Design a protein with these regions (language model features):
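FAD-binding subdomain of flavoenzyme oxidoreductases
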Residues: 92-246
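N-terminal flexible segment immediately upstream of the FAD-binding catalytic core
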Residues: 1-55, 72-101, 250-256, 299-324, ...
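C-terminal substrate-recognition/cap domain of FAD-linked oxidoreductases
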Residues: 17-29, 210, 216, 221, ...
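Short, ordered loop/turn segments at secondary-structure junctions
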Residues: 68-71, 91, 130, 247-250, ...
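Activity-critical C-terminal alpha-helical subdomain
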Residues: 410-450
Length: 450
């Protein structure tokens, strides 16, 4: 296979190397002694190179998985023998139209590099997942990501104006004009969250915004989780647009702050001073019953918001027979408090568990759980980790919650995909069969082929 690819692209773009994402179950397996094998990786220099590789793979029946920054936590690139990884890192060019606020970025563009380039021009993408320093534009799109300022800027699907995609047979579908169109459905949206199952995103057309003229953040605390969730719901249902709004449960509050008691809420407003000031006054009324903590919690959050880096995640999982993971789910406001109690009970039965709430909309928000523990042996730790996931996924089913908000599906959520999607899984299968009849694209996308 390597020889065929070298004949196709030359020797330089084809390498063998160890490739891992940040899926805790995969890292735990390696720690327990699972054999690590180098992957065959091809790194085309341009879109035509991607097209040639996929044409060849379709002809030869070789499985291909796109590779971005490797910051995924759900095992979407946990390949098996005989597969090919297609590294998109060479597609790293981008162009910023400061008049129309339109960005064209290759799939391999680093998220933080793009954001800093926009900031230099007084602009922002407004998309700040915690993986931003490592993640690529293509990966953010493929996993249907959401950022820390999503209540203000929207999720990745709200920022994508168009996509250029290479289909499994090598056809290049170029992005349409960025203006909204009613000439057929927005078919590029099929690829947002597809985890590389339908083809490979090679370029994105994205909506930028001007940096806000003013940002003002602070912290308050509530005696109960219910009171904090009620305040978040009131903020969103009054049509305010907070830049950031994050509520921590009692255990996570104790972890985040030595000053706050109860449940900490970090909230910020942004925009033109007159607009942000008006929103701040409405926030004052809604949060009047909470304990006021000033700007310190906001500043602390800003300083540490990207602290769970890829290397830190790996270091935390070095301890023998330990586990650490995150599960992000989402539900409507009426279900969130009961969902939280149910998931926490399942996770805490195996170890320690924390939760914060963010990505709020008028209908509900994301509940983001972090859990950790240890066991006498590696196998016992793996079993405890699996039980924790099962408990969380079953709780979502009981409370009408979605099992994944912004990390994607991959291998981690494979056992629960059919229950989550219902009849829509048949729609997925039909589209997949039409676009990829040879079935060469990422076999772990959306939990794997069925």
């Amino acid at each position: 296979m390597r020889r065929a690819l070298e004949q196709l692209l030359g020797t330089e773009p084809v390498t063998e190397r160890f490739v891992e994402d940040l899926w805790p179950a995969g890292l735990m397996a390696v720690r327990a002694g699972a054999e690590r094998k180098p992957a065959l990786v091809v790194r085309p220099g341009d879109v035509e190179g991607v097209s040639r590789v996929l044409r060849w793979a379709s002809r030869e029946g070789v499985t291909v998985t796109p590779l971005g920054g490797g910051s995924g936590v759900c095992g979407a690139i946990n390949r098996t023998a005989g597969e090919l990884l297609l590294d998109l890192g060479a597609l790293s060019a981008f162009d910023i139209d400061e008049s129309d606020l339109v960005v064209r970025a290759g799939a391999g563009v680093n998220g933080l590099v793009l954001e800093q380039a926009l900031n230099d021009r007084g602009l922002t993408l407004g998309h700040f997942p915690s993986s931003l320093p490592v993640a690529t534009v293509g990966g953010l799109i493929a996993t249907r990501s959401s950022g820390q300022q999503s209540s203000y800027h929207g999720n990745i699907e709200d920022l994508v104006l168009g996509l250029s995609v290479v289909l499994p047979d090598g056809t290049v579908a170029t992005a349409r004009k960025p203006a909204r169109s009613a000439v057929g459905p927005a078919l590029h949206e099929l690829f947002v969250g597809s985890e590389g199952a339908f083809g490979i995103v090679v370029e994105a057309v994205l909506a930028a915004r001007r940096l806000p003229a003013m940002v003002a953040g602070r912290g308050v605390s509530f005696p109960t989780l219910g009171a904090g969730l009620g305040a978040m719901r009131e903020v969103m249902q009054r049509d305010l647009r907070p830049l950031v709004m994050r509520l921590y449960d009692v255990e996570d509050t104790a972890f985040q702050s030595s000053e706050a008691e109860g449940c900490l809420l970090v909230v910020a407003v942004a925009g033109e001073p007159e607009v942000a000031g008006a929103q701040a006054r409405v926030l004052d009324r809604i949060l009047a019953g909470a304990s006021q903590l000033g700007e310190a919690p906001w500043q602390a959050w800003l300083e540490h918001r990207f602290r769970l880096s890829a290397e830190r995640m790996r270091r935390l999982l070095e301890a023998p027979a330990s586990y650490l993971d995150t599960i992000e789910v989402a539900a409507c406001w009426s279900a969130l408090e009961a969902l939280h109690a149910d998931v926490k009970a399942g996770l805490a039965a195996e170890g320690a568990a924390l939760c914060h709430f963010s990505h709020a909309t008028p209908q509900g928000c994301c509940a983001y759980f972090t859990f950790a523990g240890s066991a006498p042996t590696e196998e016992a730790a793996a079993q405890a980790h699996r039980r924790a996931w099962t408990a969380a996924m079953d709780a979502c089913d009981r409370h009408g919650a979605t099992i994944g908000h912004h990390h994607g599906a991959g291998s981690a959520r494979a056992p629960w995909i059919e229950r989550e999607m219902g009849e829509w899984l048949q729609v997925w299968k039909a589209i997949h069969a039409a676009l990829d009849p040879v079935a060469i694209m990422n076999p772990r996308a959306l939990g794997g082929r069925r």
